[in-house]
Amino acid sequence: MTPRMTDRAPDRTSDRASGQGTSLPAPAWQVQSLLLAYPDEHLDGRLRLARRVAAALPEPVAAPLRRFLDHAERTGTARLAAEYVEVFDHRRRCCPFLTYYAHGDTRKRGVALLRIKRTYAAAGLRLTDEELPDHLAVVLEFAAGEPEAYRKLLTEHRAGLELLRLALHDTGAPWAHLLDSVSATLPPLGGDEREAVARLAAEGPPEEEVGLAPFAPPQYMPDPVGGRR
């Protein structure tokens, strides 16, 4: 199921998004997280918050964020929600689940999901039963609360993030602007990362080896990519 980010985000948004007591990426990551969730009845409030936050962000981060906001405000919640489903639920190349790019729908992805969930739990953070821990909106939300700890998680999946960004641009999806904004908060791609992006683009994510059973508990094994989460 697509995260809707309504249970936790309102309680933890105000200080982070205003920049109080946080390092620079935290306010950006918080609003990027909210805007990468499914557009629902809270969208108008999120857009207003994001406008205020964008005014205080560096231009490379703020400019693409404003481009997304312009589109969302023109489009409205219902049409944007329909676009969201078309882009993220029906197009494998636009998968928002970061471990998919590194591991595909293999047993290794289940192990990676379990590791991420344990990382969250060690920090006292809990997911709902409907949320997978590697959805970009979820990763960004938690990164906003622990910027240094979770920057590593984002950079570990830098190649997948870049491939998602490129795929969104290829399809003309407005969320490409949000990925531009996210990328502007991270270090530039290194040579190895560029090679990984090129390899992923050419070959796609890994496929499961025949005859090997999953090593993670069944509850942490994702459904195949391509449907609502």
Regions found by a protein language model. Give the residues of each.
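Charged, alpha-helix-forming regions
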Residues: 1-7, 16-136, 140-229
